Amino acid sequence: MATYAAFKHVELYNVGKAKKRVLRAPGGVSSDIFGSEQPQTPRNVKNLMASNIFSADTDAAQKNNVRQGAHRFYYIGETPRRGQKPVDSYSRLFGEPARPITPSKNHMKSNIPFGQNPNTAPLISKGNYNGKSGSVSSASSSVSSSTENLKINGGVRSEGNPVTGEGYKAGGTDYIQPAHLNGGSQVINKNRVPPGGYSSGLW
């Protein structure tokens, strides 16, 4: 068992000394827990959704004139920030000058021609198709170059839609049928899932 002398410093040296930490009320020094009314001061809340199109920059007067960083000094207001247009009084009052209205391009419209619709088929003029000459096909893929060559040579195919399969002849010879091995009939596996699954919209 430890002696009294080993633990006497715990309480004997702290006797008579007040604690230096002062507890404060959760509401601060002026909180009143008994419910008396206190003077209400309105809070200054900045409206972040307010528009400042027609007003001058009010934050510029409150910010410092010199901004320091990485051994450089920038004077705010000397040059406009990147990405912002300089604002003068004429453009603030009357807006920007009127620009000619140009028709927008329909980016969702497909450029792939289907069937014999003359509106969707590209124009063929002087051996050029869509800005490409008939002899240049090295940069395009094999599928697009073969369709371009068909269009250039005047062999526009109108048998059907290659995506959905509508309009093709039942006994067409567009594809090469594989030879049957060992003289047996070919077994078609109906349980196969197409690439991309059935939700791809192609099947």
UniProtKB/Swiss-Prot annotation:
GO biological-process terms attached to the record: positive regulation of microtubule polymerization
Keyword Nucleus attributed: yes
Protein's name in the database: Microtubule-associated protein Jupiter
Phosphoserine found at: S30, S135, S146
Localization per record: Nucleus; Cytoplasm; Cytoplasm, Cytoskeleton; Cytoplasm, Cytoskeleton, Spindle
GO cellular component: cytosol; microtubule; microtubule associated complex; nucleus; spindle
Claim: Nucleus is one of the keywords in the record: yes
Role description: Binds to all microtubule populations.
Compositionally biased residues, Polar residues: 123-132
Gene Ontology MF terms in the entry: microtubule binding; structural constituent of cytoskeleton
Record field: compositional bias (Low complexity): 133-146
Primary location class: nucleus
Organism of origin: Drosophila mojavensis (Fruit fly)
Family affiliation: Belongs to the MAP Jupiter family.
